[in-house]
């Protein structure tokens, strides 16, 4: 068996080449730490990937990020990508929810909300009564639905809160933990009792802390991507790693060795051993659990217990002139509507460069925790389903000239009730395995910004010699 000897100094093996693993490896190597990245598949990026097809620029997974995370902007700057960040078209600020038989605009302000038809009048007045909400008892892991009903009422929870979580988690509003999925809401309740009061006070504080004239905040807060899609970030990270990134390198086993770690690797039909001081497992939870099982069965069970919602992304492209460009970012469909689609992004409206020559591109989402079985259908069936739902929900009768389907059986980690307790237990169990670290979207944030921020923090901790960093 070929043996890769341990090099001098601290060295790290990063297992998994999604955005979390790539970012950790990049940060470590840019700080002078010898790090190698091992990815079992033939490409880097994990769920993140952009494809230029037939005049369309389609994302296979995540489609954008909010330009509000310093770690993401710092990573873009380090990779010389700041000039390639593109903000969404202003039209994308308008969003829609399918409720009571049609698409309805989500109001952008409290006065607009009270005057809108997004909810029946009684439900809108109930939301206004949120000013008199009571705090939850301390130490209760409350579902997003229970939190919403207490603050906003039943209708607003079933329509608005469910739609919001669907766009992020594609989850079950009755099962998701509010503290794990929307910690800012829990913080606002704790500090201000009322979410409305908290929002008003936050706006006031923001105005008082306004920057002096002539200066501008570095972070726009805008929905953003790169000029060639999110693949631009993946390609830049891959280029920064160079030969330190190995694709087709599957880690078959992991064992403790002389205060460090030994990895058994199969790469392009050859088996090899690699000895390192530290290991970062950045693979999805199920793959991480498989590697952990021989080391610590209890830890492996904790990690394996993280549920995922399957997702299918169905892109439908329409020739110029066959239908009007849709308004706004897109629409979401609450579970109570019992439709077969979670929602759709108006991709060519949000980022016009995603479709050439006046073409129109819809990116439809199917499955989630509410209908996981739909994702098991073949691509033709999923494309037909998306066409039918788009016609029923948005009135699109034109026939698409372009279709592309991406299926993710393990799509989005579900931060269900007990998730924070589970992550704390994982962290405690890792104390028994010094030099081993977990990272990825299964633990402390599912979004691109979360992954990049957590990767930077882990790299900082490793370089500083703090080996007890939480996942």
From Swiss-Prot:
Recorded GO MF terms: oxygen-dependent protoporphyrinogen oxidase activity
Pfam family membership, one: Amino_oxidase
Catalytic activity: protoporphyrinogen IX + 3 O2 = protoporphyrin IX + 3 H2O2
Cofactor(s) needed: FAD
Keywords: Cell membrane, Cytoplasm, FAD, Flavoprotein, Heme biosynthesis, Membrane, Oxidoreductase
Regulation: Strongly inhibited by acifluorfen.
Keyword Membrane applies: yes
Compartment(s): Cytoplasm; Cell membrane
This protein's pathway: Porphyrin-containing compound metabolism; protoporphyrin-IX biosynthesis; protoporphyrin-IX from protoporphyrinogen-IX: step 1/1
Top-level enzyme category: oxidoreductase
Enzyme Commission numbers on file: 1.3.3.4
Annotated GO biological process: protoporphyrinogen IX biosynthetic process
Signal sequence bounds: none
SUPFAM superfamilies with a match to the protein in the record: FAD-linked reductases, C-terminal domain, FAD/NAD(P)-binding domain
Binding site for FAD: 16-21, 39-40, 47, 61-64, 251, 408, 446-448
GO cellular component: a single term: cytoplasm
Keyword Oxidoreductase: yes
Free-text comment on the cofactor: Binds 1 FAD per subunit.
Free-text function comment from the UniProt entry: Catalyzes the 6-electron oxidation of protoporphyrinogen-IX to form protoporphyrin-IX. Does not oxidize coproporphyrinogen III. Involved in the classical protoporphyrin-dependent (PPD) heme b biosynthesis.
Family: Belongs to the protoporphyrinogen/coproporphyrinogen oxidase family. Protoporphyrinogen oxidase subfamily.
Self-association state and partner proteins as the record states: Monomer. Homodimer.
Protein name: Protoporphyrinogen oxidase
Encoding gene per record: pgoX
């Amino acid at each position: 068996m070929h043996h890769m000897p341990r090099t001098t100094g601290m060295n790290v093996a990063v297992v998994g080449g999604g955005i979390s693993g790539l970012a950790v490896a990049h940060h470590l190597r840019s700080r002078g730490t010898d790090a190698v990245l091992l990815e079992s598949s033939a490409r880097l990026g994990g769920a993140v990937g952009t494809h230029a097809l037939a005049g369309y620029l389609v994302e296979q997974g995540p489609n954008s990020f909010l330009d509000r995370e310093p770690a993401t902007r710092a990573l873009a700057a380090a990779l010389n990508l700041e000039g390639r960040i593109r903000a969404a078209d202003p039209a994308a600020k308008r969003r829609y929810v399918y409720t009571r038989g049609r698409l309805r605009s989500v109001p952008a302000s409290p006065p607009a909300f009270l005057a809108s038809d997004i909810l029946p009048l009684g439900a809108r007045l109930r939301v206004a009564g949120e000013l008199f909400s009571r705090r939850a008892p301390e130490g209760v892991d409350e579902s997003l639905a229970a939190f919403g009903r207490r603050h906003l009422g039943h209708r607003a929870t079933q329509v608005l809160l469910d739609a919001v979580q669907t766009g992020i988690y594609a989850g079950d509003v009755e099962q998701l933990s509010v503290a794990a999925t929307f910690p800012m809401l829990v913080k606002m309740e704790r500090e201000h009792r009322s979410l409305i009061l908290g929002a008003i006070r936050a706006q006031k504080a923001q105005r008082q802390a306004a920057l002096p004239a002539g200066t501008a905040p570095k972070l726009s807060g805008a929905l953003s991507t790169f000029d060639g899609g999110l693949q631009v970030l993946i390609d830049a990270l891959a280029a920064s790693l160079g030969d330190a990134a190995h694709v087709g390198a599957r880690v078959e086993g992991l064992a403790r060795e002389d205060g460090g770690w030994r990895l058994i690797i199969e790469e392009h039909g050859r088996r090899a051993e690699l000895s390192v001081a530290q290991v970062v497992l950045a693979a999805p939870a199920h793959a991480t659990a498989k590697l952990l099982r021989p080391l610590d069965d209890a830890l492996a069970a904790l990690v394996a217990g993280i549920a995922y919602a399957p997702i299918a992304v169905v892109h439908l492209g329409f020739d110029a002139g066959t239908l009007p460009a849709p308004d706004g970012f897109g629409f979401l469909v609450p579970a109570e509507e019992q439709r077969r689609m979670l929602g759709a992004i108006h991709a060519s409206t949000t980022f016009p460069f995603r479709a050439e020559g006046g073409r129109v591109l819809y990116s439809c989402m199917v499955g989630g925790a509410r209908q996981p079985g739909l994702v098991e259908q073949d691509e033709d069936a999923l494309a037909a389903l998306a066409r039918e739902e788009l016609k029923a929900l948005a009135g699109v009768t034109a026939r698409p000239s372009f279709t592309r389907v991406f299926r993710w059986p393990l799509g989005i980690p579900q931060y269900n009730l007990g998730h924070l307790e589970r992550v704390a237990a994982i962290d405690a169990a890792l104390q028994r395995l010094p030099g081993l670290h977990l990272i990825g979207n299964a633990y402390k944030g599912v979004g691109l910004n979360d992954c990049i921020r957590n990767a930077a923090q882990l790299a900082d901790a490793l370089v500083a010699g703090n080996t007890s960093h939480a996942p």
